[in-house]
Amino acid sequence: MSVVSSVTVTVPATTANLGPGFDCIGAALTLYNKVKFTRLDAGGLIIHVTGKEAEGVNTDESNLLYQAFVKLYQHIEQIPPSVKIEIDLGVPLARGLGSSATAIVGGLVAANQLAGEPLSQLQVMELAIAMEGHPDNVVPALLGGCRLAATSAEGWEICDVPWDENVVPVVAIPDFELSTQEARRVLPTEFSRADAIFNTAHLGLLLRGLATGKGEWLKTALQDKLHQPYRKALIPGYDAVNQAAVAAGAYGMVISGAGPTLLALADAQNSQAVAAAMQTAWQTVGITADVRSLSLDNQGASSLNEG
């Protein structure tokens, strides 16, 4: 077997929860981080980062991408090689778009390639879930598409969620960060039976709405009572952006992951108008946002090896 000297891995951003699917559903989006790992003969660790938020990325052994790389080698009981890591940041940090998942998946996939692919994709996925602590970002980042994850006696059951091509995700990414830890602190530790039933019903409706593209179902399905009512207070202008998105023709708006990015779903004809309305609404409260009409990424993490 020839030794792989370098590998380039491209990993998509992800949006998790989609309203009622708290901690169990996520989708890959056409926004990417690209990382290149190259073996070093001289030893040591070199990390170079490019991109708008490059200064926010650690360039030592605490780097999450590198930690994931080392984790796989520890799992297969091998010593990780010395590497140079080049990171091209396209996914904003701490915005609710799965930046940590791109690092975990990117590091694991790169390590698996440099090690000669000792692990299956399923095994890589299980390692990624263990590192992240929940499946809703790392699974679609690795596999692509929209994915629903549930625990089973054997581990995880992963289900592909059909997504009608006319349902367009519009993301509004503000110029401020919100940590997942902070967003989780505001959540209650217990929920009422009524709220649990509400979310169960709305998640079922969401799955059918995404599969069929039926707007009336999606307008109802995107509601949630388990996390968004508590988290929206952490996002200035949330109500104004929501009202603007719906007025422009969106089916509804949700918090992407832990936030602060806001995600609207719209049909293809309305997506650009929805994007413009969300951007304007945030501007009225003094917040600059990068608003994009995206698509679902159906490939997930991809790698290119060099001998």
Swiss-Prot record:
Highest taxon of source: Bacteria
GO molecular function: ATP binding; homoserine kinase activity
Signal peptide as annotated in the record: none
EC category: transferase
GO cellular component assignments: cytoplasm
Subcellular location: Cytoplasm
Keyword Kinase carried by entry: yes
Reaction(s) catalysed by this chain's protein: L-homoserine + ATP = O-phospho-L-homoserine + ADP + H(+)
Keywords: Amino-acid biosynthesis, ATP-binding, Cytoplasm, Kinase, Nucleotide-binding, Threonine biosynthesis, Transferase
Entry EC number(s): 2.7.1.39
Binding site for ATP: 92-102
Biological processes annotated in GO: threonine biosynthetic process
Keyword GTP-binding: no
Family: Belongs to the GHMP kinase family. Homoserine kinase subfamily.
Protein name, per record: Homoserine kinase
Organism, as annotated: Microchaete diplosiphon (Fremyella diplosiphon)
